Design a protein with these regions (language model features):
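Contiguous hydrophobic, helix-prone segments at protein termini
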Residues: 1-244
Length: 244
């Protein structure tokens, strides 16, 4: 069982770039489809139900599933990172340095939230318009209620998994890590491992950011049709999508 588990772990880490690339293709398709859907909605609100239902299925396959895959990888990555800390390969300070080095969407949010000029505020809104305290709660108002395509210009960068990790550990720490991997008979090198760890944790957060944009827009579209039919938001749980 242990040998089988090691083999699965090795395969997951050594081939993660190809797997992550395929996951990202689904997320990119979802985001592009979201933008196209909003354009259709703005042009023709009457004959829209079929497109809406198709897109809701796409959210499952190209949003929720990719996020779940990244969440699973992030769980493995965090376990590995914790094992390095427990085995004194890295100390708590270095552990935090690795986590703080991640260019997650939260890093972008914090950077933009401090900026003041009109262009930067517009860029902030384009990225984070969809946020609401309860991601899946239709009753809670989001950052901006306007339903617009809001395309992301740097989508590839948000989903990038080629992290600059050479500076994170000292040569002594790298040597200790490679010895630890060899001792545990894992055919993985430091570069591949640390890139997998940082990419997995980063992309868990960034993939959720992508698919919740679609969730948020779907909720706003449902609210639009509910208002058209004088359906109260609190009553929406009693309706199927065909009834709205």
């Amino acid at each position: 069982y242990i040998d089988s588990l090691k083999e699965i772990t090795e395969n997951q880490i050594n081939n993660f770039q190809e797997k992550f690339h395929n996951i990202n293709k689904k997320l990119i398709k979802l985001e592009n489809s979201r933008s196209s859907l909003i354009k259709k909605f703005r042009n023709n609100k009457k004959n829209f139900l079929i497109d809406l239902k198709k897109f809701m299925n796409l959210i499952k396959s190209n949003g929720i599933v990719p996020f779940a895959q990244y969440a699973r990888n992030a769980f493995i990555a965090k376990k590995l990172l914790n094992s390095f800390l427990d085995n004194k390969i890295i100390d708590k300070k270095k552990y935090n340095k690795i986590l703080n080095s991640l260019e997650t969407i939260t890093t972008t949010y914090l950077k933009y939230s401090k900026l003041k000029n009109k262009k930067e505020k517009s860029e902030f809104l384009n990225l984070f318009y969809h946020l609401r305290p309860g991601t899946y709660d239709i009753n809670i108002r989001r950052q901006n209620k306007k339903i617009l395509p809001r395309e992301i210009g740097n989508l590839d960068l948000i989903l990038n998994f080629n992290n600059k990790v050479n500076h994170l550990l000292t040569s002594k720490e790298i040597k200790k890590m490679n010895s630890f991997l060899k001792k545990n008979q894992l055919s993985i090198n430091y570069d591949q491992l640390i890139n997998y760890v940082t990419s997995s944790i980063k992309l868990r957060e960034n993939s959720k950011f992508i698919f919740t944009r679609s969730i948020s827009d779907i909720l706003e579209i449902i609210k639009f049709y509910a208002k058209e039919k004088n359906i109260k938001l609190n009553d929406l749980n009693n309706y199927k999508i065909d009834q709205i």
